[in-house]
């Protein structure tokens, strides 16, 4: 189902949600569906994580902030008609930070896919993945914090928002149609 999208201006589709909320699954599906380039904080920061030992939480956050800056630098240097998929938990920094990066990167249109997830499901998914995560990511001690985060997290709302209920099976066709209509 590879479809071509055009927006006529620099556009980002933010795939947003707390850790373990399903962002990567949706990002990969949309990239395959529309043939769009994607950028993720983890894919940028994890190659650097293997270069260091004993990555603590503050250093992990520094790497995340640097990866975030790389994302917006790449988007800022891209042609004006590119549509980017950006997979991140955008709530890890103030909303104003994202607003500044969007402006500096020359983004004219923002669409957001919000991954709504219950605290219980987020914790369960994160716990299941602990043994597969690169060293340096928060471990089991993060689970109570993640539960609180999932309870209060909200979308950024810089443009139209499509909410994916992670308690339900993903309807990629419905989501794809919404994106086509929204960007059309």
What kind of feature is each model-predicted range?
Residues 24:
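Walker A/P-loop
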Residues 63-107:
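Glycine-rich phosphate-binding loop used to anchor ATP phosphates in small-molecule kinases
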């Amino acid at each position: 189902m590879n479809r071509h999208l055009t927006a006529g201006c620099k556009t980002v589709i933010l795939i947003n949600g707390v850790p373990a909320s399903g962002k990567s699954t949706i990002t990969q599906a949309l990239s395959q569906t529309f043939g769009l380039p994607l950028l993720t904080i983890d894919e940028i920061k994890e190659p650097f994580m293997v270069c260091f030992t004993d990555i603590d939480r503050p250093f992990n956050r520094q790497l995340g902030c640097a990866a975030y800056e790389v994302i917006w630098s790449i988007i800022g240097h891209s042609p004006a008609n590119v549509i980017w998929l950006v997979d991140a938990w955008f709530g890890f920094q103030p909303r104003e930070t994202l607003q500044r990066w969007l402006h500096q990167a020359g983004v004219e249109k923002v669409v957001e896919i919000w991954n709504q997830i219950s605290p219980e499901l987020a914790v369960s998914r994160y716990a299941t993945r602990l043994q597969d995560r690169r060293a340096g990511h928060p471990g089991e001690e993060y689970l109570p914090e993640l539960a609180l985060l999932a309870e209060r997290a909200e979308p950024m709302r810089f443009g139209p928002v499509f909410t994916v209920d992670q308690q339900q099976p993903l309807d990629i066709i419905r989501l794809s149609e919404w994106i086509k209509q929204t960007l059309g």
